[in-house]
Amino acid sequence: MWPRSHRHLCLAFLLVCVLSAISFLIHFHQDSIRHGLGLSVLCPDRRLVTPAVAIFCLPGTPMSPNTSSSCPQHPASLSGTWTIYPDGRFGNQMGQYATLLALAQLNGRRAFILPAMHAALAPVFRITLPVLAPEVDSRTPWQELRLHDWMSEEYADLGDPFLKLSGFPCSWTFFHHLREQIRSEFTLHDHLREEAQSVLRRLRLGRSGARPRTFVGVHVRRGDYLQVMPQRWKGVVANSAYLREAMDWFRARHEAPVFVVTSNGMEWCRENIDASKGDVMFAGDGQEASPWKDFALLTQCNHTIMTIGTFGFWAAYLAGGDTVYLANFTLPDSEFLKIFKPEAAFLPEWVGINADLSPLWPLAEP
């Protein structure tokens, strides 16, 4: 039997060991939380085949109901890893996102987006596709496929498990069967929706001061298209005659509409769109570097007048309602028609108004 003093020493030693272990675990846990959440977190997906793929959970997500899920779980039936190269502007990347989601589901593959696409879309929408870590992207043995802008039969049976898509797909033929899912992916964050609705609530009809019954979003694409369309594609952008005819189409069918005009050429719009009836509001800010305010306004309208471009397409697609678009905006021999099929670009129920091609007649082949 040990003397009492020895027993006390042993008990004290054991107590110190236990307290030290507890202190270590507490500090380790706190340090993990502090540093782990302050940096990007890698969430390994152990179900993937070699090479291992990780979901890249960006800092601060999810922090509120408005943010995207950081590590969503793919159904167990899906395999492989597909992504798409983010290219172009806001509307282009929306088309790439929707097409990736649809084709991956069709082929039973898991879809991931790259950080640049997340940076472009996540501040605006509640997107849910996980983000691929750059180091995993660089190690993956990708097969590459450049898509054309309409659904083809071969896209329904793509066998590559590691596929990186590219191109500028924005055709409803890829994803319209998933329309509600696509609309859900492109749900605006609350603050953007509320700000847009606040702008619309303040609008009044000029002559009577009454509240509008119907909001028609108008997107007028100008900017670089002023040179690109005639010089490269033998095409035109919308003129004032088209916009007048499109507005008259809605005036004939809807009571007391108001036209909410957005554009990357607002000065031209103010000078060329007839606002004398008191039902035209120049609401857009025209900021191409931060287009989401204009986009949010358009999607909260009941109907849409679009000209050309993917920005207008997505505004119309998400708003629903009636859509009027600029039709036949290139000469018949335009190279543009080799990469663009109107029947795959515009929904069948949308209403087309032919463009005025007279400025292009000097370019027409005899």
From Swiss-Prot:
Q: What is this protein called?
A: Galactoside alpha-(1,2)-fucosyltransferase 1
Q: Where in the cell is it found?
A: Golgi apparatus, Golgi stack membrane
Q: Which CDD domains match?
A: Fut1_Fut2_like
UniProt keywords (A-Z) are:
Glycoprotein, Glycosyltransferase, Golgi apparatus, Lipid metabolism, Membrane, Signal-anchor, Transferase, Transmembrane, Transmembrane helix
The scientific name of the source species is: Saimiri boliviensis boliviensis (Bolivian squirrel monkey)
Q: Which PANTHER family match?
A: GALACTOSIDE 2-L-FUCOSYLTRANSFERASE, GALACTOSIDE ALPHA-(1,2)-FUCOSYLTRANSFERASE 1
Q: Which gene encodes it?
A: FUT1
* Residues in compartment: Cytoplasmic: 1-8
Catalysed reactions, semicolon-separated: a beta-D-galactosyl-(1->4)-N-acetyl-beta-D-glucosaminyl derivative + GDP-beta-L-fucose = an alpha-L-Fuc-(1->2)-beta-D-Gal-(1->4)-beta-D-GlcNAc derivative + GDP + H(+); a ganglioside GA1 + GDP-beta-L-fucose = a ganglioside Fuc-GA1 + GDP + H(+); a beta-D-Gal-(1->3)-beta-D-GlcNAc-(1->3)-beta-D-Gal-(1->4)-beta-D-Glc-(1<->1')-Cer(d18:1(4E)) + GDP-beta-L-fucose = alpha-L-fucosyl-(1->2)- beta-D-galactosyl-(1->3)-N-acetyl-beta-D-glucosaminyl-(1->3)-beta-D-galactosyl-(1->4)-beta-D-glucosyl-(1<->1')-N-acylsphing-4-enine + GDP + H(+); a neolactoside nLc4Cer(d18:1(4E)) + GDP-beta-L-fucose = a neolactoside IV(2)-alpha-Fuc-nLc4Cer(d18:1(4E)) + GDP + H(+)
Q: Which GO terms describe its cellular component?
A: Golgi cisterna membrane
Which residues of this chain are annotated as glycosylation sites? 66, 302, 328
Its main localization is: Golgi
Q: What family does the Swiss-Prot or TrEMBL record give for this protein?
A: Belongs to the glycosyltransferase 11 family.
Provide the membrane-side ranges marked Lumenal in the record.
26-366
What InterPro entries does UniProt report for this protein, alphabetically? Glyco_trans_11 (IPR002516)
